[in-house]
Every structure is written in structure tokens, then in C-alpha cells.
Design a protein with these regions (language model features):
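Membrane-interface loops
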Residues: 48-57, 107-197, 244-274
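N-terminal transmembrane-helix/juxtamembrane module of multi-pass inner/ER membrane proteins
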Residues: 1-97
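Aromatic-anchored segments of alpha-helical transmembrane domains
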Residues: 35-39, 125-133, 203-216
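Interfacial helix-loop-helix junctions of multi-pass membrane proteins
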Residues: 139-146, 168-172, 207-233
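Hydrophobic alpha-helical transmembrane segments
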Residues: 89-104, 126, 177-182
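Membrane-interface capping segments at transmembrane-helix boundaries
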Residues: 2-10, 238-251
Length: 276
């Protein structure tokens, strides 16, 4: 099967045709997964009342934990036109464009590692779809809690990148803006050779985590949940990768083991003859 075989570049051979076939397969998997993700996420949009009630639960929990920082953070940012523009820019251009760029970089820089991060993204996306369907949450910008949508007030670029018809308005929990940027940051830090690449990997998820909160698109707990799901998905993808890489070695060791020698034939019995 092409999908099963396509997990490792070396399994496709060294010819240019084999490599093109590999990357066409990988591109098809990623594009297909994104289409399915947006399609299913849109279909699982919950009711406004349920989403608002769940959002209230999250805000109450944050208050009890003393981490309800969204109002103070946004007030600080909106009072500075420069900070607000930076936050909006990070939210708009720091998500899908960055994901595409990092995956493309991995495809060239470390093809075998590319599939690891791609699989982690697919696993976390599947978990997210289940949560979106069973626990819809309205973002702060849609509630009457004194927070404003800074992104759409100052720019319409985000609506071009993610048209409203493809967006589930009640998919605040978890935040994959923060989670998937964390995954891309981990990839840059672990796979990058240059210092500036690793620095970008460290700054990127922090900037996005702050951005999603100050733009009123997510709660702080959404960021925590997104990060936890992505880290768990990466751990699972790593475990599956290790098992797959060990399997050929185990088979080879069995094949190389010499077959046991046949048991020696029993010695012929002596026949005693009586002297004549």
C-alpha cells in the first residue's frame, strides 16, 4: 500500500521518480487531512447556548485557579496600537503560513523526521475534532464579557486565510493556533542546525500563545489544553515510529539466526553372534 509504504523515504528507493512519488503522496496526505479537518470541524459546530455555557465553565475555573488574565492582558495591548498590530499579525500570519513553511523545510532538511511531525499533527487534530464535537466552547470575543475581537476590527486578511464558511465559531477548546505552533517550534529547535532557527522555534509558540489570548480568540486554558494534546500526540507518534523502525531489525535477526543442526543418527546396534 502506498500510504503504509510512504512513511519512510528510503522505502521508496533512490530514483528521482520514486522520490517524486513519495512527496506527492505526502502532500496528498497533508492536504487531504486539512480538508477533512476543516470539513468535519465545521460540521461539528455546536449550539450557541451550549458553547456559551461551556465557556462560562472555563472562565469560572480560571477564576478559581487565579489565572483569569484575559481582560488585563487585552487591556494592556489595546492601549498600545503597536502591540495590538503585532498581536494581530502573529495571529493571522503565524499559523497556517508558518505550518506550511516549517513542514516544507522539514521535507527538505529532514525527510524522515517530516513524517514524525506530520503524524503528530494528524493525531492531535483527530483528538481536537472529537473535543470540538462533544465540548463546543465559544471564544471570549463572542461573549459579552468586555473583550473585543481585535483581529477582524483591524484586518480582513484572516478571513481570507480561513473563510467564515470553513470556520467552526465554537472551537475555542483546545487552541491549535497555540498547539500546532508549539509543534512547529519543537521541530525547529530539535531539527535546526543554525542558532537563529532554534531561536525562532523558541519565540514562535510563546508569541502565538500570547496572541491568541490578547486577541480574545482563546482562553488561557485553551492554550494549555492545545499544548498538552500536541505534546501527547508527539510522544505517541514517536512511540509508533520507534516500533516501526525496530520491526525490520527483529525480523532480520530471526532470519539471520542459523537453523539448528539435525540431530545425529543413532548409532547402529551391535549384533552379537554366537561362536560356532
Amino acid at each position: 500500500m502506498a500510504l503504509a509504504r510512504g512513511l519512510r523515504l528510503e522505502e521508496w528507493g533512490d530514483s528521482a521518480t520514486s522520490r517524486r512519488r513519495f512527496w506527492l503522496t505526502q502532500t496528498g496526505i497533508v492536504v487531504g487531512a486539512i480538508v477533512v479537518y476543516f470539513g468535519v470541524r465545521t460540521l461539528t459546530e455546536g449550539s450557541p447556548e451550549t458553547a456559551a455555557r461551556h465557556a462560562g465553565w472555563i472562565m469560572d475555573l480560571e477564576q478559581r485557579l487565579g489565572i483569569d488574565v484575559e481582560p488585563a492582558m487585552q487591556e494592556y495591548v489595546v492601549n498600545s496600537d503597536g502591540l495590538a498590530k503585532v498581536a494581530n499579525w502573529v495571529y493571522i500570519w503565524g499559523h497556517w503560513p508558518v505550518i506550511v513553511a516549517v513542514l516544507a523545510w522539514l521535507a527538505v532538511r529532514a525527510p524522515d523526521r517530516f513524517t514524525l511531525y506530520r503524524n503528530a499533527m494528524l493525531i492531535s487534530g483527530l483528538v481536537g475534532i472529537v473535543i470540538f464535537a462533544t465540548f463546543p466552547v465559544a471564544p471570549p470575543r463572542l461573549l459579552d464579557v468586555g473583550l473585543i475581537d481585535t483581529v477582524t476590527q483591524q484586518s480582513h486578511a484572516y478571513r481570507v486565510l480561513q473563510p467564515p464558511s470553513l470556520v467552526n465559531q465554537y472551537a475555542a477548546m483546545p487552541s491549535f493556533h497555540a498547539g500546532w505552533d508549539l509543534l512547529m517550534g519543537i521541530a525547529l529547535v530539535r531539527e535546526g542546525r543554525r542558532l537563529w532557527v532554534r531561536v525562532v522555534g523558541l519565540v514562535l509558540p510563546v508569541a502565538m500563545a500570547l496572541s491568541v489570548v490578547v486577541t480574545a480568540n482563546h482562553y488561557l486554558l485553551d492554550v494549555v489544553a492545545g499544548a498538552a494534546i500536541v505534546v501527547g500526540a508527539l510522544a505517541l507518534a514517536t512511540r509508533l515510529r520507534e516500533r516501526r523502525h525496530r520491526r525490520p531489525l527483529v525480523l532480520a535477526s530471526h532470519e539471520a539466526r542459523p537453523s539448528p543442526l539435525p540431530a545425529p543418527a543413532p548409532a547402529p546396534a551391535l549384533v552379537q553372534k554366537q561362536a560356532s
